[in-house]
């Protein structure tokens, strides 16, 4: 029989843990509904307000989906909650753009090699298509280029075949949107900006050819260039 949660401090947090345990014990998958709020409260031995607070907390973490009057459902995990945590950690600890790039480099040197070995034909084709669209957007504002750049790196992580890598790379999206323009402005000439896109094209071409070594070399060149232009612009 389930033991009721009676400790006053941290009731909602304990209820959140109890709901997570229930999800695993019942083998619930993304999209599956949870028991009603009343049933959950009885199962956990807490009040309905505590249960409601726990459900909201799990929804914020993207563990649950709560929409309107529907029952809470198990959510398909995404990087949104982790992205907020990373953004706060970067701000609160005063981390530099260079430090963020160092972490991204470590992750993406691995994802690009795996993507070259595991990518689908559709993923490889889309990567090349993104680079073509980046060239086309070069004459316009940087907003389109930023979104294409973010999509490019996200797709490589997805093509690695490892969902954790995909979530980790995607979790940088808030930071990337805040800092992307700084890096772009640091590429002061049209040719330098075009060279940056050419590097993306080399990455995509290597992934299409399933050449992991060449893909890793191109990704290393990409991050070397990013670090270099920021240093020249005085960004540390």
Residue ranges and their predicted role:
Residues 1-107, 113, 117, 235-236:
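Short linear motifs at protein or domain termini
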Residues 1-2, 212-236:
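C-terminal effector-binding regulatory domain of bacterial HTH transcription factors
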Residues 10, 102, 143, 193-194:
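Short helix-capping and inter-helix turn/linker motifs at the boundaries of alpha-helical repeat units
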Residues 15-16, 24-27, 33, 121-128, ...:
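Hydrophobic/basic alpha-helical segments enriched in Actinobacteria
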Residues 22, 26, 81, 175-183, ...:
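A short secondary-structure junction motif
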Residues 79, 149-153, 190-197:
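Short alpha-helical linear motifs
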Residues 104-182, 199-205, 214-226:
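Conserved amphipathic alpha-helical segments that form helical-bundle/coiled-coil interaction surfaces
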